[in-house]
């Protein structure tokens, strides 16, 4: 199977990258959906979206997970959020490549730090695994994670019989 890949020039161009989306499912109604730069641009986007009852609704349980690299008492926020037409923080500038083979993988570079993030939905279970690999760092490096849980819902699409 061939990989779906995007490079730094494509990822750094928000007009381009915000139009490219990724989707991974657990095959029982849950999914992860966002853009290739991890900026949620649609109401149904999120890292963990799942039905939690027998209703016709899915719930965005985890909207985003913001990562911050800390090195030499300096912080580098890797996140990208859209607020009323503006984008902050602009962490997409640290993304060097995106690859979907079959797991969405994003590589960040901040100075001498190279960090790889892999996102995997577990089939038949509503579980998301995110693995971070510190590929290279020239000095002590810490990673801070901040989850953005939310609890809004939307109706699931239905199949209608003719």
PLM features: what roles do these ranges have?
Residues 128-136:
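Short, well-ordered beta-strand segments enriched in hydrophobic/aromatic residues
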Residues 10, 14-104:
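An extended acidic
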Residues 120-122, 135:
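Short beta-strand micro-motifs enriched in acidic
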Residues 104, 141-143:
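Short beta-strand/loop motifs in extracellular/secreted proteins, especially
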Residues 153-160:
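Conserved small/polar residues in nucleotide/adenosyl-binding loops
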Residues 107-120:
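Low-complexity, acidic Ser/Thr/Pro/Gly-rich terminal tails and inter-domain linkers that flank the onset
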Residues 143-149:
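Surface-exposed beta-strand/loop patches in extracellular or lumenal glycoproteins
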């Amino acid at each position: 199977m061939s990989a779906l890949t995007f490079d730094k020039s494509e990822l750094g161009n928000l007009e381009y990258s915000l139009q490219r989306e990724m989707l991974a499912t657990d095959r029982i109604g849950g999914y992860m959906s966002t853009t290739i730069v991890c900026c949620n641009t649609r109401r149904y986007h999120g890292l963990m979206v799942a039905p939690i009852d027998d209703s016709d609704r899915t719930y965005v349980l985890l909207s985003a997970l913001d990562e911050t690299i800390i090195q030499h008492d300096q912080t580098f926020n890797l996140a990208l959020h859209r607020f009323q037409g503006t984008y902050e923080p602009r962490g997409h500038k640290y993304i060097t490549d995106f690859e979907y083979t079959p797991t969405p993988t994003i590589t960040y570079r901040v100075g001498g730090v190279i960090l790889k993030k892999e996102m995997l939905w577990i089939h038949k279970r509503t579980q998301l695994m995110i693995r971070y690999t510190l590929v290279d760092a020239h000095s002590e490096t810490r990673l801070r994670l901040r989850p953005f849980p939310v609890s809004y819902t939307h109706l699931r699409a239905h199949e209608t019989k003719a």
